Design a protein with these regions (language model features):
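Paired intracellular helix-loop junctions of major facilitator superfamily
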Residues: 92-103, 132
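C-terminal transmembrane helical hairpin of 12-TM major facilitator-type secondary transporters
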Residues: 41-92
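Transmembrane alpha-helical segments of major facilitator superfamily
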Residues: 18-26, 113, 144
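A membrane-interface helix-boundary motif in multi-pass transporters
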Residues: 125-144
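Loop-to-transmembrane helix entry
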Residues: 9-24, 104-108, 136-139
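Short, small-residue-biased leader/transition segments that mark boundaries at the very start
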Residues: 1-2
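Multi-pass alpha-helical transporter architecture, strongest
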Residues: 142-160
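Helix-to-loop junctions at the C-terminal end of transmembrane segments
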Residues: 28-42, 128
Length: 160
């Protein structure tokens, strides 16, 4: 059950529209970043910059508590960054590896990503249950995303 008091006592229809905004921004951002990355033939920073933006915005999100517009804006842009990096990111393995090595690396990346899909919500839920707040979990998420961006900066893939 959704507690409307946590959503500024908005009607369910208003909440629905607010929840639809981040995926819409992500759709636009992912399309634009993918197009830009292909046009410029550059992958690394087209992946790193959206991730870094998402990390910063998720880290700042707890500071927006009490301001609906800033909170929704922070999550809209953060979700956009979390999806915008994907086209450039998925082009990178085949730039460094070929054939079965590229296929194996993509499989490994997917497997590790699926582990993140399990551990992320588990840790976030544990932090919320332990502290009574999602703030620590959001900081954990922001740091995890920032580490991912840092890894991509230093990944030895030539000239990207």
């Amino acid at each position: 059950m959704l507690f409307r008091s946590q959503w500024y006592n908005l009607k369910l229809s208003a909440i629905t529209w607010l929840v639809l905004l981040p995926p819409f921004v992500a759709l636009v951002a992912q399309t634009f970043v993918g197009w830009s990355s292909d046009r410029r033939q550059e992958r690394r920073y087209h992946a790193v910059i959206p991730l870094a933006l998402a990390a910063v915005l998720i880290g700042l999100a707890p500071l927006t508590q009490g301001n609906l517009v800033l909170t929704v804006l922070a999550f809209m842009l953060a979700f956009g960054g979390l999806k915008a990096y994907l086209p450039a990111f998925w082009a990178m393995p085949s730039m460094a590896l070929t054939g079965s090595a590229a296929a194996g690396s993509i499989g490994l990346i997917n497997s590790l990503g699926n582990l993140g899909g399990f551990f992320g919500p588990t840790v976030l839920g544990w932090v919320q249950k332990t502290t009574g707040s999602f703030v620590g979990g959001l900081y954990y998420l922001a740091v995890s995303i920032a580490v991912s961006a840092a890894i991509l900066v230093f990944l030895p893939i030539g000239g990207t």
